[in-house]
Curated annotation (Swiss-Prot):
Keywords: Chemotaxis, Cytokine, Membrane, Transmembrane, Transmembrane helix. Its main location: membrane. It is found in: Membrane. It comes from the Eukaryota. GO terms for molecular function: cytokine activity. Residues 36-168 form the MARVEL domain. The chain crosses the membrane at residues 41-61, 70-90, 105-125, 147-167. The keyword Transmembrane helix applies. InterPro entries: MAL (IPR013295), Marvel (IPR008253), MARVEL-CKLF_proteins (IPR050578). Belongs to the chemokine-like factor family. Coiled coil: none annotated. This is CKLF-like MARVEL transmembrane domain-containing protein 8. GO terms for biological process: chemotaxis. It comes from Mus musculus (Mouse).
Length: 173
C-alpha cells in the first residue's frame, strides 16, 4: 500500500524568469495622455470614430446586402473604425513610447493616407448607390451614411495632413 502512495507522489519545481518579473513591473505603471484629445489630431480621431460609427450603423440597420456596393462601404467603414479605435488607445496610453522599434510617424501617415483614399472611394460608392427607387424605406439611412462618409473622409484628409507634417519634420532631422 505504501508503494502505491509513493508512486503517486511527485515533486513540482517552479521557476520564475526575468521576463515575468520585468513584465509585472512595466505593466503596473499605466500612462495616460489626456492632453492628446485636445490636439487637432486627437480631435480628428474622435470625430473619425463618432462619424465612422454613424456610417456603418446607418448602413447595417438596413437591408444593405441587397445592394452589393454597400458591402465595400461596410468593409471600409468597419475596418477603419476598428483600427482608428486601436490607434486612439495607442496614442492615449502612450504605447508608442514603449515600442520605439515601430516608426509611428510613418505608420500614422500610411494609415491615414490609406484611410483617406479608401474612405473617399467608399463615400463615392455610397453616394452613387443611394436611390429612392431601389429600396425606398432605406433611402434616408443610406443618404445619411453617404453624408457622414464624406465627413469622415475630410477628417482622415486632415489627419493625413498632420501625419505628413510630423513625418516630414521627423525625416528632416
Amino acid at each position: 500500500m505504501e508503494e502505491q502512495q509513493r508512486a503517486r507522489s511527485h515533486t513540482v519545481t517552479t521557476t520564475t524568469s526575468s521576463f515575468a518579473e520585468n513584465f509585472s513591473t512595466t505593466s503596473s505603471s499605466f500612462a495616460y495622455d489626456r492632453e492628446f484629445l485636445r490636439t487637432p489630431p486627437g480631435l480628428l480621431i474622435v470625430a473619425e470614430i463618432v462619424l465612422g460609427l454613424l456610417v456603418w450603423t446607418l448602413i447595417a440597420g438596413t437591408e444593405y446586402f441587397r445592394v452589393p456596393a454597400f458591402g465595400w462601404v461596410m468593409f471600409v467603414a468597419v475596418f477603419y473604425w476598428v483600427l482608428t479605435v486601436f490607434f486612439l488607445i495607442v496614442y492615449i496610453t502612450l504605447t508608442y513610447t514603449r515600442i520605439p522599434q515601430v516608426p509611428w510617424t510613418t505608420v500614422g501617415l500610411c494609415f491615414n493616407g490609406s484611410a483617406f483614399v479608401l474612405y473617399f472611394s467608399a463615400a463615392i460608392v455610397d453616394a452613387s448607390s443611394v436611390s429612392p427607387e431601389k429600396e425606398g424605406h432605406n433611402f434616408n439611412s443610406w443618404a445619411a451614411s453617404s453624408f457622414f462618409a464624406f465627413l469622415v473622409t475630410i477628417c482622415y484628409a486632415g489627419n493625413t495632413y498632420f501625419s505628413f507634417i510630423a513625418w516630414r519634420s521627423r525625416t528632416a532631422q
